[in-house]
């Protein structure tokens, strides 16, 4: 028994080394003074300073931050409302729509990316043809040209972020006392007041977790962004890929370290919130059981 336990521990250690040793090496060499990736020449921060003078990186960072924040906000609103709608359905319709909701998460990113790209190209072509038709008929030409860009990138991120918000909010809905909203309305609150002042506060942990997950997924996405951003827009993941294709620069180590740190901090926040939520729920159930036993 002890021998099997020891082998299991060694196996787990080897797995963790295999997973995290490359990331650790990347982080260490992001502070290496030499461009040589095999020789340590001393500690430096100038690769991080160089990022501040790289216009392509700065623009990609602005695009990444803008898309991630906007996508997280919109997906949080849509996902919360959709979760409430799913929860209000009967069992079979709910199971059907939950299955549909799970498709973007289980589907390969490249399939989702190509599908969204074809959809956006189709609609942009229709809109451009409509603008051309209106111009031919009226002589008034609108100075617009619909194409893949920031808007299509944002719509794509909203599309794959929303299911994660739904899955984060649904557990809170299952724990919600259905009588709270009715009790608030019996006491004189309008349905909207009951929703905003009674229901939403109960859903806040799931909503916040869903928003953080959505933001993390957007910051980290490459494949779907690559197909839906077009030629004029690039996020950080795409910029790192472009730099790596040209040559492996120490700046890639620096920007990858920054991305890893951002994602890791957000994941820690999510896990801490989940643990605290579970502890609070356990305390609440324990208090109810104690009161019931009296």
Describe each PLM feature range.
Residues 1-5, 70-101, 114, 118-121, ...:
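Transmembrane-helix boundary motif in ABC transporter permease subunits
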Residues 2-4, 48-56, 219-276:
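Interhelical loop and adjacent transmembrane-helix boundary motif
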Residues 2-10, 86, 134, 170-185, ...:
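C-terminal transmembrane helix and the adjacent membrane-cytosol boundary/short C-terminal tail
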Residues 4, 35-71, 245-246:
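Periplasmic/extracellular loop-to-transmembrane helix junction in inner-membrane transport proteins
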Residues 11, 16-23, 103, 107, ...:
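Transmembrane alpha-helices
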Residues 21-55, 226-231, 283:
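Short membrane-interfacial helix/loop motifs at transmembrane-helix boundaries
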Residues 36-41, 45-46, 50, 110-158, ...:
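Membrane-interfacial helix termini and adjacent extracytoplasmic/periplasmic loops
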Residues 58, 62, 66-78, 82, ...:
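Hydrophobic alpha-helical transmembrane segments of multipass integral membrane proteins
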């Amino acid at each position: 028994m002890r021998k099997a336990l020891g082998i299991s521990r060694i196996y787990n250690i080897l797995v963790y080394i295999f997973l995290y040793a490359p990331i650790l090496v990347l982080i260490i060499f992001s502070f290496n003074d030499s461009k040589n990736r095999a020789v340590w020449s001393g500690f430096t921060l100038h690769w991080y300073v160089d990022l501040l003078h790289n216009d392509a990186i700065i623009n990609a960072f602005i695009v990444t931050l803008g898309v991630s924040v906007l996508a997280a906000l919109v997906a949080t609103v849509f996902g919360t409302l959709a979760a409430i709608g799913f929860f209000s359905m009967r069992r079979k319709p709910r199971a059907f729509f939950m299955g549909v909701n799970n498709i973007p998460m289980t589907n390969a990113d490249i399939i989702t990316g190509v599908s969204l790209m074809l959809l956006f190209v189709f609609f942009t072509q229709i809109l451009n043809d409509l603008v051309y038709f209106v111009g031919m008929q009226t002589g008034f030409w609108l100075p617009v040209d619909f194409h893949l860009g920031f808007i299509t990138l944002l719509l794509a991120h909203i599309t794959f972020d929303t299911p994660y918000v739904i899955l984060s909010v649904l557990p809170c809905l299952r724990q919600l006392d259905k009588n709270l909203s009715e009790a608030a309305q019996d006491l004189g609150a309008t349905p909207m007041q009951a929703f905003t002042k009674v229901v939403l506060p109960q859903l806040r942990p799931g909503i916040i977790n869903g928003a953080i997950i959505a933001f993390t997924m957007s910051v980290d996405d490459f494949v779907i962004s690559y197909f839906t951003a077009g030629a004029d827009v690039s996020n950080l993941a795409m910029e790192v890929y472009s730099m790596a294709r040209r040559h492996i620069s120490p700046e890639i180590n620096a920007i990858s370290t920054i991305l890893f740190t951002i994602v890791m901090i957000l994941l820690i926040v999510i896990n801490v919130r989940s643990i605290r939520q579970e502890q609070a729920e356990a305390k609440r159930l324990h208090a109810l059981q104690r009161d019931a036993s009296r």
